[in-house]
Amino acid sequence: MAELQGYXRLKKDRFRQQNFLYPLLLQEYIYSLAHYHSFNSLIFYEPVEILGYDNKSSLVLVKRLITRMYQQKSLISSVNDSNQKENGFWGHKNSFSSHFSSQMVSEGFAVILEIPFSSRLVSSLEEKRIPKSQNLRSIHSIFPFLEDKLSHLNYVSDLLIPHPIHLEILVQILQCWIKDVPSLHFLRLLFHEYHNLNSILTSKKSIYVFSKRKKRLFWFLHNSYVYECEYLFLFIRKQSSYLRSISSGVFLERTHFYGKIEYLIVVCCNFFQSILWFLKDTFIHYVRYQGKAILASKGTFILMKKWKFHLVNFWESYFHFWFQPYRIHIKKLPNYSFSFLGYFSSVLKNPLVVRNQMLENSFLINTLTKKLDTIAPVISLIGSLSKAQFCTVLGHPISKPIWTDLSDSDILDRFCRIYRNLCRYHSGSSKKQVLYRIKYILRLSCARTLARKHKSTVRTFMRRLGSGFLEEFFLEEEQSLSLIFLQXIPFLLHGLHRERIWYLDIIRINDLVDHS
């Protein structure tokens, strides 16, 4: 595999110098690299056949696909073919073959599109001589950041980044980075095959299903789109931080406020500094994960409304579509809880009374402290487990029929790994009762799955193997967490269930958390 990657690097450098990416679609090693990446990133509890991958890559199918792609005339004419629905985009009457071919192309095309971005990142790092670790941010850094900063802020804007209405917007974004016109036209052909993708992108449930089939390509396009959205925010934030306080800024802001909606571009050109002066805030923070972001500030409510107004207008002028301002909610932190990264977070006020003794006089001083409180959402977690067929909507455990063909050790391993990931990710919750309920659901669902496989009842099955049969598997995670916590602070044994532990060895968020 290392030799294949080295050969691919030489070929990519040659095509990159010529600014041609489309010929890489006709190279066999591209599809081998795409298959290697996709197979190693599968979700542990997900059947391989759902994603359409096998544990072996078929070189024969790749050769046939490349042969059909050489016939560009038939490929382009298939767009206007009246029998396209019958024969499929790739000339297959078999829907499975057509789906498999399009899936191979989309995964390979995603690898090709990442070449200009990866080479540009490496070259910029080499020029600036900055280590890569300082330019990357893990999702685990978000939790300590919110815990340290959010309790000192006043307002938060909870916003959802809308998906582009038309897919041509995604192509136009890539035009700024990729100069290969045939590759962009081929991307349009892929979009034409999924003519109903517009409804898929606007549906959260459909994104979850669709991302498992074309995950790498469309997450790459989505990240490129989000990057452009964040670029405008960072531009305004950076420019406003350089400005000084101008006394005449109040007059300019009041005069041209009502004309900004109709003459936004003119106002930005003529009075850009006066606009940015009113957006100046040294205590503003921005956090994003996927399509959800948080904009927190220590300023006033009017300042947050101005940020919302200008961000929406700049985004609409740049992307040329309505950005749905109702998706941005401005709330005051002590009175508002928001959902982010699988937690319900809020800022709690804790009143404290301190006795101050001075000589013969004593005083009682009332103080108020703020603390970030994070709670695992039990309703959304049960809903996610219900969609995965581990329990009912009300939280009653049920068996997993699709896993009855596996061995007993595989069934136990899958249930324990799901519980371990959920337990570790939500270990920062201030209320541990949610984790105990998740453990109960998965433990009983595992017992019912094993009993169904052996054609027995749960009571008979557990009586035959003993009541401690499942405990040794599910107690392993709790014991590991207890040992880690006791090594750090051994004198807080009585408060173990109240403490929050940010478990920072998670490679990726579990899909049950990610799409809840």
Curated annotation (Swiss-Prot):
Family note: Belongs to the intron maturase 2 family. MatK subfamily.
Native source organism of the sequence: Phaius tancarvilleae
Localization in the cell: Plastid, Chloroplast
UniProt keyword tRNA processing, yes or no: yes
One Pfam family per UniProt: MatK_N
One annotated GO molecular function: RNA binding
Keywords, comma-separated and alphabetical: Chloroplast, mRNA processing, Plastid, RNA-binding, tRNA processing
GO cellular component: chloroplast
InterPro entries in the cross-refs: Domain_X, Maturase_MatK, Maturase_MatK_N
Protein role: Usually encoded in the trnK tRNA gene intron. Probably assists in splicing its own and other chloroplast group II introns.
Chloroplast recorded as keyword: yes
An example Gene Ontology biological process: mRNA processing
Main location: plastid
Protein name: Maturase K
